[in-house]
């Protein structure tokens, strides 16, 4: 658990720190859902071996919302900007102070962004009607 906590501290959001207690509670909950070190290793190899995919982004035809942390130490914000620019009609939201995580302090904001995106992009007949 200490290694996982250290990783979260490195990639986490500098403007939205979480307490040690909450950090360990979240790690414990994740471990209780399941842990597969071999699966993580396979995923890392797959990421490294997947190669360049930006040429595929212009072929995305569904509405896209790109949310990227301005303080992401793992994937530079320029990559999020490029991703949104390459997807036709994509909307970009750069969150100041956010790293490569979803801090509890931002969950409401992230959910609101996703909700607005989905409500605005769904066909009118698919939206739920008030009772």
Model regions and ranges:
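Short beta-strand/loop motif that positions the catalytic acidic residue
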Residues: 60, 66-68, 72
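Short, conserved loop/helix-junction motifs that constitute active-site signature segments
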Residues: 58-60, 86-87
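Catalytic active-site module of serine/aspartate enzymes centered on a nucleophile-bearing elbow/loop
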Residues: 90-131
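Conserved alpha/beta-hydrolase "acid-adjacent" motif
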Residues: 73-79
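Alpha/beta-hydrolase
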Residues: 1-55, 62
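Hydrophobic/aromatic residue at the end of a short beta strand that borders the catalytic acidic motif
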Residues: 7, 75, 102
């Amino acid at each position: 658990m200490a290694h996982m906590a250290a990783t979260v501290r490195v990639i986490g959001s500098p403007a939205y720190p979480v307490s040690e207690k909450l950090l360990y509670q979240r790690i414990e909950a994740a471990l209780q859902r399941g842990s597969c070190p071999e699966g993580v290793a396979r995923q890392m190899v797959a990421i490294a071996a997947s190669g360049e995919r930006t040429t595929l982004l212009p072929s995305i035809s569904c509405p896209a919302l790109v949310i990227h942390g301005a303080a992401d130490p793992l994937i530079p914000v320029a990559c999020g900007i490029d991703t949104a620019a390459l997807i036709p009609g994509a909307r970009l939201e750069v969150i100041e102070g956010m790293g490569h995580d979803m801090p509890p302090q931002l969950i409401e904001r992230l959910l609101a962004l996703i909700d607005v995106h989905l409500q605005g992009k769904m066909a009118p007949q698919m939206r739920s009607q008030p009772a």
